[in-house]
């Protein structure tokens, strides 16, 4: 495992390791479908193994950065298991549920993985939003309880002594609450990205995250900002924005 190779990594001059998701997951999307944020995927070991790796890495001057996936969870996460049971349970609004429209999906949004971004659920005769796999329901960041759950989980990891977070598609956590149809560029489905990327409250949420968690620890943060232009990227990581330290985005791949 990683721990046994730390000396080799140090000899190479590596001083930071970024771990892709190692949390408990059904592994529908390479671990980006998390079913328990406070457990390690069995294929990788145990939490005791993680703690030992972190300790040994720090002994060698190597920092550990965790992947943070909080736009969505696995459909096997305890929150979603409860959320889908009824329309009035305490976890219902942890996710984005909508009534169908004329016997079809709530709008024409397509998933990043193909097909509709809405999955019908027979238990309550409603649809839930998943911008990625149908096994990755999007969290409802409009719900303050969801945000507090996320901040509590982040604090838990910071207290362990990790050195940073790489935040997966973090600019997608705020959705346009009118959920309008998207432009149909090709195919059958509309593009959801104009209504979920750089949404109306995303900077509010990140400032709140910074105030409640990040500023309390000596950690590095880098956010993945899907479909963000360079001028907007600077709003996430400006010197005085109190949000993230860095972002990476993909505008450059379309140059030339």
Regions found by a protein language model. Name each.
Residues 225-256:
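Noncatalytic carbohydrate-binding groove/subsite architecture in carbohydrate-active enzymes
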Residues 162:
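Conserved protein kinase catalytic-loop anchor
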Residues 1-155, 159, 172-229:
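Acidic/aromatic-lined carbohydrate-recognition and catalytic surfaces
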Residues 17, 165-167:
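Hydrophobic residues within beta-strands of alpha/beta enzymes
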């Amino acid at each position: 495992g990683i721990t046994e190779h730390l000396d080799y990594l140090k000899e190479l001059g590596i001083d930071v390791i970024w771990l892709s998701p190692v949390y408990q997951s059904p592994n529908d999307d390479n671990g980006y479908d998390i079913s328990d944020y406070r457990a390690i995927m069995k294929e990788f070991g145990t939490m005791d193994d993680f703690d030992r790796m972190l300790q040994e890495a720090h002994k060698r001057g190597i920092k550990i950065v965790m992947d943070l996936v909080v736009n969505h969870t696995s459909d096997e996460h305890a929150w979603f298991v409860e959320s889908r049971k009824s329309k009035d349970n305490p976890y219902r609004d942890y996710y984005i549920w909508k009534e169908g429209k004329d016997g079809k999906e709530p709008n024409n949004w397509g998933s990043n993985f193909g097909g509709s971004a809405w999955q019908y659920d027979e238990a309550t005769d409603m649809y839930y939003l998943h911008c990625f796999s149908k096994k990755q329901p999007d969290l409802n960041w409009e719900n303050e309880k969801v945000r507090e759950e996320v901040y509590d989980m982040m604090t838990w990891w910071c207290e362990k002594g990790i050195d940073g977070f790489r935040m997966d598609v973090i600019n997608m956590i705020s959705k346009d609450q009118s959920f309008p149809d998207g432009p149909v560029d090709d195919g059958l489905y509309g593009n959801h990205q104009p209504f979920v990327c750089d949404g109306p409250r995303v900077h509010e949420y990140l400032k709140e995250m910074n105030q409640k968690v990040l500023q309390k620890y000596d950690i590095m943060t880098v956010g993945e900002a899907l479909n963000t232009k360079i001028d907007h990227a600077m709003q996430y990581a400006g010197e005085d924005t109190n949000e993230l330290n860095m972002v990476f985005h993909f505008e450059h791949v379309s140059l030339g």
